[in-house]
Amino acid sequence: MADHQTTKIDKSNHLLLDQTLLRLPYDLMRKNFRNAHFVVEHESKAITKLLKDTATGSLKGKHSSDDVLKNIDAMLAKAKGIKRKLQACSDEEARLYRQLGARIKHVGEVVSMETVDDVRYEQWSRTRLDRLIVDYMLRHGYNESACALADDRGIRDLVDIDTFIHMSRIQESLANRSVTEALAWCHENKKELRKIDSNFEFMLRFQQYIELVRSQTLPKVLEAITHARKYLIPFKETYPHEVNQAAGLLAYPPEQTSDSYSNLWGQERWEMLSTLFIETHHRLLSLPSFPLLHIALSSGLSALKTPACHTAGARDLADTPNSAPGNSLDSSMCPICSAELNELAENVPYAHHSKSHVEHDLVLLPNDRVYGKARLEEYARKSGLPHNCVKDLRTGEIYPASRMKKVFIT
């Protein structure tokens, strides 16, 4: 029977990995509520003001009946606009509640289990793996494949497809040298960006200024100066270096090479803005900066990694993944020594084992495989072999028991 401590589920680690699974819908619901509140506050003030002006003008005879009807039509249009916007907020809230309910149920399933031997754990683990793969694909721009996988596995409520698709759309617009969608996103999250002291909007405005100056035409240069006065100069205390560079760009056109300004004219700045957007987006939504799959994989690799996994023999094994299965080292089942994971696991720490689970009666077979003697004898007995023969548990090779050699761990 397996050691209970080795099969017991560490629920705290599971919950630690799935923090964003529950936090993101909650944060999005708060944002959705603020949007609905803003719509009601802003639009109701406009309707109230128009109603008051209409009533006052009508009583004083300043408005004709046609003017009053036009104002009433305008108020009705605004009211319909409020209803439409609130309906969108209501639909979004219902979607987020559905997501949150599905995620609470998903996390609750593992909380109700005690060991990995539970028959439900394998299915739960497969669902979690599908979630991590979808998250990885969304972060790397494979949106259609991620959606197809989520729909096929029925886990759409457990992954943040809409959030990452919106992010990738803005990222793509920056790659196409447009800041329009990114600025709209900054406007939607103005208060939150101010709280985290983000410089993303300033860098977008700075890039707008650079593109205006790049044209080197008088109207565009004058527009750039106006743009700088409105969006850059007010931040001269916060970003003095960038503001000084903006002023210097007027004296150093693109065709003149200068170490201080050549990097500002380079198109790689758009890649920098794209990277900065992703960092800001993840920070704003409390998302990990790298895929959750990497976290889970690194933990698993570390738990299995030993110093022998990156010896010369292990590297030779990783370089020859198609070797014949009859060879002892080439048929190793160690995932760290495999060609796919050997390089990935090189920088993760070694496993920390406070308790040994190595069999006490290890013996070496002629094919250089090591097993516990009791296991070999039991397997031979179940296989109907003579009492003086043993059978390799993996390859099925049969050897005389006299050819086994005792193994001592040093």
From Swiss-Prot:
One of its GO terms (biological process) is proteasome-mediated ubiquitin-dependent protein catabolic process. Residues 125-157 form the LisH domain. GO terms for cellular component: cytoplasm; cytosol; GID complex; nucleus. Keywords: Cytoplasm, Metal-binding, Nucleus, Zinc, Zinc-finger. Belongs to the FYV10 family. Involved in the proteasome-dependent degradation of fructose-1,6-bisphosphatase. This is Protein FYV10. It comes from Pyricularia oryzae (strain 70-15 / ATCC MYA-4617 / FGSC 8958).
